[in-house]
From Swiss-Prot:
Species for this entry: Pyrococcus horikoshii (strain ATCC 700860 / DSM 12428 / JCM 9974 / NBRC 100139 / OT-3)
InterPro entries (UniProt xref): Deacylase_DtdA_archaea (IPR018033), DtdA (IPR007508)
This protein's record includes keyword Metal-binding: yes
Gene3D superfamilies (alphabetical): AF0625-like
The name this protein goes by in its record: D-aminoacyl-tRNA deacylase
Upper classification of the organism: Archaea, Methanobacteriati, Methanobacteriota, Thermococci, Thermococcales
GO biological process: D-amino acid catabolic process
Molecular function per GO: D-aminoacyl-tRNA deacylase activity; zinc ion binding
Catalytic activity of the protein: a D-aminoacyl-tRNA + H2O = a tRNA + a D-alpha-amino acid + H(+); glycyl-tRNA(Ala) + H2O = tRNA(Ala) + glycine + H(+)
Family annotation (SUPFAM superfamilies): AF0625-like
Family: Belongs to the DtdA deacylase family.
């Protein structure tokens, strides 16, 4: 079973959930999760919790405890907040390059699913009639302690956008498309660790939208430098085979560029300098 995770404390999450139920034929089941109704459509369930999802480490275990199955993949339907209040549709995997400021553990990473995130970008971009930004975000926040692949898909960046009906529809349709197609998409994409650039990963986003690269974890410039151990830890937390390390050269620190280059060589991965 595939899981779409939502929370009552997030207006964007509730917006997306309502659109999923209205537009895609999800039906309420007799099951509950964290005291909330579970909705089902084919092999996809919508689960709802009562607190911020970024703190929900071991969610996969909790699903198994409460519902008796281990999910194949978890899509977190969420809001994105930023001071700039940039209207945006974003996707990313969770993890902490350093200290855990917002959920998860220090220097720990969730399992990335690059094909699902790439398909999310492509579908959001195709459906985006709002004129908003569509982009990756760098790896950040929790949860990190999950043993099944997961990704966040978000409406940003202020309440005005979180409750926007069309944004809710776009994300709902994107999630359904991605969960139906990510396994088929795998063979067409080149999976990469992304390094460099700002939080919204402009170069990685462009490469994913225009070419065959599919990014998992993304290390932005503001989180650099990291140790060799941390970079290897991130590389080991991909649910799909990593084929390349991509570096936004100008958007990276010198020591991080060199570390990426030497690791690519050592691990037999393609090194892509942009």
């Amino acid at each position: 079973m595939k899981v779409i995770m939502t929370t009552k404390v997030d207006k964007a999450s509730m917006n997306i959930m309502n659109k999923l139920i209205e537009n895609f034929g999800f039906k309420e089941t007799e099951y509950v999760f964290d005291g909330n109704p579970v909705y089902k459509r084919g092999d996809v369930l919508i689960l709802t919790t009562n607190d911020e999802m970024i703190y929900y480490d071991y969610l996969d275990r909790e699903i198994e405890n409460q519902l008796g199955f281990k999910p194949e993949i978890i899509a977190f339907a969420s809001r994105h907040s930023s001071k700039q209040k940039l209207p945006a549709l974003t996707t990313h995997v969770t993890g902490n390059w350093g200290k855990a400021m917002y959920g998860g553990k220090d220097e720990s990473f969730a399992v990335a699913i690059p094909s699902a995130m790439k398909l999310s970008l492509l579908k959001m971009s195709e459906l985006n009639d709002l004129g908003w930004t569509v982009c990756y975000e760098a790896t950040h926040h929790g949860p990190t302690e999950l043993e099944v692949p997961s990704f966040f898909i978000e409406i940003g960046s202020s309440e005005e956008e979180w409750i926007n009906d069309r944004a809710g529809e776009i994300i709902a349709e994107t999630i359904i498309y991605v969960l139906d197609n990510y396994e088929k998409g795998r063979s067409k994409f080149k999976v990469a660790l992304g390094i460099g650039g700002g939080h919204y990963a402009p170069k990685q986003t462009k490469r994913a939208l225009e070419g065959d690269l599919a990014f998992g974890h993304i290390l932005p410039k503001y989180a650099q430098p990291v140790s060799r151990d941390v970079m290897i830890k991130a590389l080991n937390r991909f649910g799909e085979k990593v084929e390349a390390i991509y570096v936004d050269w100008k958007g990276s620190r010198g020591e991080t560029r060199q570390l990426a280059k030497s690791l690519a060589q050592e691990l037999g991965l393609e090194f892509i300098k942009d």
